[in-house]
Amino acid sequence: MRIIGLTGGVGTGKSTVARILEQHGIPVADADQMARQALAVGSPIRERVLERYGKVIQTPSGDLDRRRLGQIVFADAAERAWLEAQIHPFVRAQLQDFLSALAEQSSKVHGVPLEEEPASQKRSGVGFSSGQGSQTVCLMIPLLFEAHMENWASEIWVVTCTPEQQRQRLARRDPLTPEEIEARIASQWPLAEKVRRADVVLDNSGSLAELEAQVKQALASAGQRPFASPPRAGYSDG
């Protein structure tokens, strides 16, 4: 199974790339959406979050005020680490279920038994055979590097744009103040470091057509080497 780990900076255009991949028939798992599910009504994680912060993060109707929660965690690294410790295990489990279901489906369609890759060829957290019944899937994980999940992907794609575009897009997308935008950007690894560690870099500073061409080229070229690289040293999926 060819597993694309799609990441980048906040507001650089990961979702746009994900939509392009879906147009190519590639299943995409959205870690951000899974994180939102972790805080859904009735979730034990939501209850722990409400217990910690109380009415400060509740709307008058009793709903979770996600913007207020964001203001708290993006202003305090310790609080952000606590929240991530609640949510990340749930997201990891959801991603593993996504991969397992696709691998099982592929084995039924193609009649190829599921086999683990040799230890020297697999990255931790996945490890499904890349033989006849292999397929391409995408895990869109904004915090792929920060959460030490590099080893979940057979190749890592990083989406970039200019700093000015990044801030403009965030301002258009969310009702954030300039200070809140800077806090969100600062909470992640520098984009230059993500680019340095990427297998594929997609420049989203131009037109949609230009981005689509880059994605098409990456699909054609990078797909020749699934699981070719050993796990990156110094990281685990924990």
Swiss-Prot record:
This is Dephospho-CoA kinase. PANTHER family: BIFUNCTIONAL COENZYME A SYNTHASE-RELATED, DEPHOSPHO-COA KINASE-RELATED. Residues 3-233 form the DPCK domain. InterPro entries: Depp_CoAkinase, P-loop_NTPase. It is an enzyme of class 2 (transferase). It comes from Synechococcus sp. (strain JA-2-3B'a(2-13)). Belongs to the CoaE family. It is found in: Cytoplasm. Its main location: cytoplasm. Residues 110-129, 219-238 are annotated as: Disordered. Its EC number is 2.7.1.24. Pathway: Cofactor biosynthesis; coenzyme A biosynthesis; CoA from (R)-pantothenate: step 5/5. GO terms for molecular function: ATP binding; dephospho-CoA kinase activity. Transmembrane segments: none annotated. ATP binds at residues 11-16. NCBIfam families: dephospho-CoA kinase. Keywords: ATP-binding, Coenzyme A biosynthesis, Cytoplasm, Kinase, Nucleotide-binding, Transferase. GO terms for biological process: coenzyme A biosynthetic process. It catalyses: 3'-dephospho-CoA + ATP = ADP + CoA + H(+).
